[in-house]
């Protein structure tokens, strides 16, 4: 069977790498892909933008694509799944209406309230003055979010009232995030431990993927600006078996059932960004309608099941017939970023020191990398993710750090403390 993966990041490299291991897969096409996907066995890049829906549909029809997996959020929010289904094509992902869970933070907060799913207290605003009045009433620390998609950067965790007021003015009067910022959500600051809880959904049945923990801040010890994610590890020890059961019972099933009840049957990856409170209660920070990046990279390193089979079963509404199998080891991925990220960053620097052959229990997934004149050069903010398995999170971290040191280019940087919470638990 031919398979199409939509997207061009490290997440898509990991999905293509895993899909290529399936005995069901003859050929994997990635649109548009990157320099990493181009190097994988059985994988070929296709020069079509992830948001050029008509061209993607035509390609899938012309190349007998039996399954399409959507990586990023943008194509989902513009209805790529609806278009593929209308053409009678098999695609794993939520419809445009169901993807509002990620596309609109206000929709999500209102949905959670309707279905009594635990989350932070919040209010939506479109005007500056009422928003500022609410901030002054609540005080800091407080969280200000741009409604809509802002590539993971439209969230300000304000530790002072001044910071919060600046963010509101920026997003509403200055509209710093274009259209996405014309409405803001202001919500209470939750002081717990974050976890990424990703599941596969076929409309009614749910198959949990491995848990993970992402590191959003650019600096060590979680300081500095928010990014798309600087590293992740799996599993997340904060999600104990008891908390896992609570998340399924209090968050995941009510969400899947609630979406279906409202006429937006949910199929695809569903990623709940959770805050686990000190008393063990999970609260929803956000939903994403896709696999996380960089969480996908360490999670795929641990997945022992056939990803293609799982997705096909989900497309057929038969997820209850399969069970995902996981390597019991821990995995950890560290993002190597370009100088200046998450602001304006350098591009076009040659990368050296990449592993020349496959090493068991280790993998470098490429993201913002392009091939130019036979060399690999940087062309994104998050350039690649070095990923390793270990008997403990600490061992996986040390192996990943060793790998990170070998990969070089001008001005590259990375966090050396990815996984620090789990490592502290292990000591």
What does each of the following model-derived ranges do?
Residues 21-23, 38-39, 92, 114-116, ...:
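Solvent-exposed alpha-helices and their adjacent loops that cap or buttress functional pockets
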Residues 45-51, 123-127, 158:
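Short acidic-hydrophobic, aromatic-tinged amphipathic segments that line or gate anion-handling sites
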Residues 154, 158-296:
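Internal nucleotide-binding/catalytic subdomain
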Residues 369-373, 378-427:
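Generic C-terminus detector
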Residues 248-270, 288-359, 371-372:
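Active-site "cap" helix and flanking loop/linker of ATP-utilizing ligase/carboxylase catalytic domains
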Residues 1-97:
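ATP-binding N-terminal substructure of ATP-dependent carboxylate-amine bond-forming enzymes
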Residues 92-154:
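A conserved helix-loop-beta module that forms one wall/lid of the active-site cleft
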